[in-house]
UniProtKB/Swiss-Prot annotation:
Full protein name: Tubulin beta-2 chain
Cofactor(s) it depends on: Mg(2+)
Described function: Tubulin is the major constituent of microtubules, a cylinder consisting of laterally associated linear protofilaments composed of alpha- and beta-tubulin heterodimers. Microtubules grow by the addition of GTP-tubulin dimers to the microtubule end, where a stabilizing cap forms. Below the cap, tubulin dimers are in GDP-bound state, owing to GTPase activity of alpha-tubulin.
Binding site for GTP: Q11, E69, S138, G142, T143, G144, N204, N226
Primary localization class, coarse: cytoplasm
Organism: Hypocrea rufa
Binding-site residues, Mg(2+): E69
Cellular compartments annotated: Cytoplasm, Cytoskeleton
Amino acid sequence: MREIVYIQTGQCGNQIGAAFWQTISGEHGLDSNGIYNGSSELQLERMNVYFNEASNNKYVPRAVLVDLEPGTMDAVRAGPFGQLFRPDNFIFGQSSAGNNWAKGHYTEGAELVDQVLDVVRREAEGCDCLQGFQITHSLGGGTGSGMGTLLLSKIREEFPDRMMATFSVVPSPKVSDTVVEPYNATLSVHQLVENSDETFCIDNEALYDICMRTLKLNNPAYGDLNYLVSAVMSGITTCLRFPGQLNSDLRKLAVNMVPFPRLHFFMVGFAPLTSPGAHSFRAVTVPELTQQMFDPKNMMAASDFRNGRYLTCCSIFRGKVAMKEVEDQMRNVQNKNSTYFVEWIPNNIQTALCAIPPRGLKMSSTFIGNSTSIQELFKRVGEQFSAMFRRKAFLHWYTGEGMDEMEFTEAESNMNDLVSEYQQYQEAGIDEEEEYEDEAPMEAEE
């Protein structure tokens, strides 16, 4: 069985994680104590992708919950699914990282990291065939970004051949939670580029937009946002957990989605999203799902793919879906919007089908796109970073924890390189022979 070890770090990571486990437990027919009371054999068949079976039919999430302060953990423990998790897997410090990346990465986080790795090791050793790790964190805070990336590199050292998927909540364009967000995010991206295999970029503002515009919620709470994220996370791993005609897993996803090793930052989307009142007025069909899935308003990261081009993308359909219909729709999308796909990758779209839809829906689809327009996101953070860094604002908080200014400069240039790489492949055409013009006469002489 292809097991996944799930690590949630920081406040944001733990809250998204809590929503995710609620979604997954529901799909597998588990109640809030981890006792199975589902209706279908299929729910049990691959339970152990995310759950360990404990004594007397209790299933326990293979989750490691990490934070540098006990507050969020207590909230998770007191929440509706708090009794689900194994108590040993809660690992928290008492000091908090105070939105400071250096604290999470070098001082406070570094003290806690060995404890976390012990638990991760224990969980990994209990697996038959470990597929990889999923990490949820935000890039704006201290723990999720600093300690999350520290864990990422430590786990990478120890399990170099396992997949690393991160769900990273990136800073929003207009709404900022913390002033030093650009610093924390840039330092994190610097790590993610090197150590992650797939990074799914999510941002709160795009989620708010979806909640207000599509789901028609007047004042969405974080719970609603986390629900959207957990729908996508469930969709991405659905093929591991339920049988389907076309399977995909984290590794297949990476092979099909990452044309160049550094360009592994994806946009995600989910369909069908309808407001509660409008359910009865829409038929959920494959064309309808496809249209909504490729709609820029449905993307959960604030960058518009119409400003760039897709290198690759992947669509995962769930439910009773005809294979042929999906293929026709995908071909249709590529032919109609050919300008949005790079022409030097002929078949950009990977599809996966899974027979079991999410709870309460007949069919659904999850979209993952590797678009060059994600550079907007990094550009935006980079501009904010350089504005602050030029004046060395807030820098003493980081240097006080033992960081060097060089690290900031390195992180900044690494992120700028990433942006220019995306730009380069966005502009690349299929017949670029300009570079070889000087050499042409030589061939003629031969």
